[in-house]
Regions:
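Viral structural modules
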Residues: 1-142
Length: 142
C-alpha cells in the first residue's frame, strides 16, 4: 500500500527456535515487505539482511527489550521488464526482541545467517508484490 508516495514498512517477526533456552538464543526472523513493483514469482529475489544491535532497555523486573536494526536491499526482476533490468528496494528499520534475565545484561551480540527469499502469490499467479525472507539470527546476551 502506498502512503503519500511511500511504501509501507516491512513486517518483521522474530520467532524463538524450539529448544533455544540459553544464550546464544536462535531466532528465525520472518521479513515480509510489499514491493514497489510486481515481481516475477518464478525468479528468486536477492536479499541478504544485515542485523546490528542498537540498544537494550529494562521494561520491568527481570525483563528487557533488545532493539535490533535490520538493513538490506531486495533486488528483484519486475514483471514488466527482463532479467537484465532489476529493481532494488531498501529495508532499513528496527524491531524488538523481549528478553527475560535475572541478571542485568551487560553485552548483546547479534549475528545473522543465510536467508531464504521468495516472491509469494496465489496459485497460477505469475507476478506478485509480496516479498518474504526467512533469516536465522543468533542473539548472545551476557
Amino acid at each position: 500500500m502506498f502512503i503519500m508516495g511511500k511504501i509501507t514498512s516491512a513486517i518483521i517477526t522474530p520467532v524463538l527456535a524450539a529448544g533455544s533456552t540459553t544464550s546464544p538464543y536462535l531466532f528465525q526472523v520472518n521479513i515480509t515487505q510489499r514491493l514497489c513493483h510486481s515481481s516475477c514469482i518464478g525468479l528468486q529475489p536477492s536479499f541478504f539482511p544485515i542485523f546490528s544491535f542498537k540498544e537494550i532497555s529494562k521494561v520491568a523486573d527481570n525483563q528487557y527489550m533488545v532493539r535490533v536494526h535490520l538493513e538490506g536491499t531486495i533486488v528483484y526482476v519486475p514483471c514488466d521488464g527482463n532479467e537484465c533490468c532489476t529493481k532494488g528496494q531498501l529495508i532499513s528499520q528496527d524491531f524488538s526482541i523481549p528478553v527475560a534475565s535475572v541478571n542485568t545484561p551487560t553485552s548483546v551480540t547479534v549475528e545473522g545467517g543465510t536467508p531464504v527469499n521468495a516472491i509469494v502469490g496465489q496459485p497460477c499467479q505469475k507476478c506478485s508484490r509480496t516479498f518474504v525472507s526467512e533469516a536465522p539470527l543468533s542473539l548472545t546476551i551476557a
